[in-house]
């Protein structure tokens, strides 16, 4: 899809919004990284205060995908830091959305990747590799499934069951 704002996507797709095929995430995310606008097919990971699975995905080629991490909204530690974000950038991920905290904000803000997270926190997560991958996640009341499409800009984040064109 050529760049069209999320607001324009919503305006042009009212029927998809009414049917639930196009959903907007609640405006709870902070914007990090140099790429403020990003989109791509979704890969989901569900973890809690552990980033082992996140790191496994980031080591793969991203091919323009968006990693959606449901960290349970925890604000007790950061489940993503600068090194993995640099690796995600280098491996071709379009963006990462974290329902939780990140750290190394200055380093992340220098990366050419889009990152959304609830906040920053200096304490790092464990690395046990606990969690689930490629499962439906629920972030602030919005269900997101592996393989859906995510569109993010400075107005917000949209999730669609199908790839959109306006």
Curated annotation (Swiss-Prot):
Q: Which GO terms describe its molecular function?
A: 4-hydroxy-4-methyl-2-oxoglutarate aldolase activity; metal ion binding; oxaloacetate decarboxylase activity; ribonuclease inhibitor activity
According to the UniProt record, list the residues that bear N-acetylalanine. Answer: 2
Q: Which UniProt keywords apply?
A: Acetylation, Lyase, Metal-binding
Instruction: Please write the reaction equations for the catalytic activity of this protein.
Output: 4-hydroxy-4-methyl-2-oxoglutarate = 2 pyruvate; oxaloacetate + H(+) = pyruvate + CO2
Q: Which SUPFAM superfamilies match?
A: RraA-like (SSF89562)
**GO annotations of cellular component type:** plastid
Give the required cofactors. Answer: a divalent metal cation
How is the quaternary structure described? Homotrimer.
The name under which this protein is listed is Putative 4-hydroxy-4-methyl-2-oxoglutarate aldolase 2
Instruction: Give the originating organism.
Output: Arabidopsis thaliana
């Amino acid at each position: 899809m050529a760049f069209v704002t999320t607001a324009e996507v919503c305006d042009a797709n009212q029927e998809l919004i009414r049917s639930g095929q196009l959903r907007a995430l609640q405006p709870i995310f902070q914007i990090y990284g140099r790429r403020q606008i990003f989109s791509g097919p979704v890969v989901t990971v569900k973890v809690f205060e552990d980033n082992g699975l996140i790191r496994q995905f980031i080591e793969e080629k991203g091919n323009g995908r968006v990693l959606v991490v449901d960290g349970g909204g925890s604000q007790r530690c950061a489940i993503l830091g600068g090194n993995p974000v640099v690796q995600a950038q280098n491996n071709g991920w379009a963006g990462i959305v974290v329902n939780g905290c990140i750290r190394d904000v200055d380093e992340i803000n220098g990366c050419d990747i889009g990152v959304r997270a609830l906040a920053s926190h200096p304490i790092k997560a464990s690395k046990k590799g606990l969690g689930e991958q490629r499962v439906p996640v629920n972030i602030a009341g919005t269900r997101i499934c592996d393989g859906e499409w995510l569109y993010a800009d400075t107005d917000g984040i949209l999730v669609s069951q199908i790839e959109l064109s306006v």
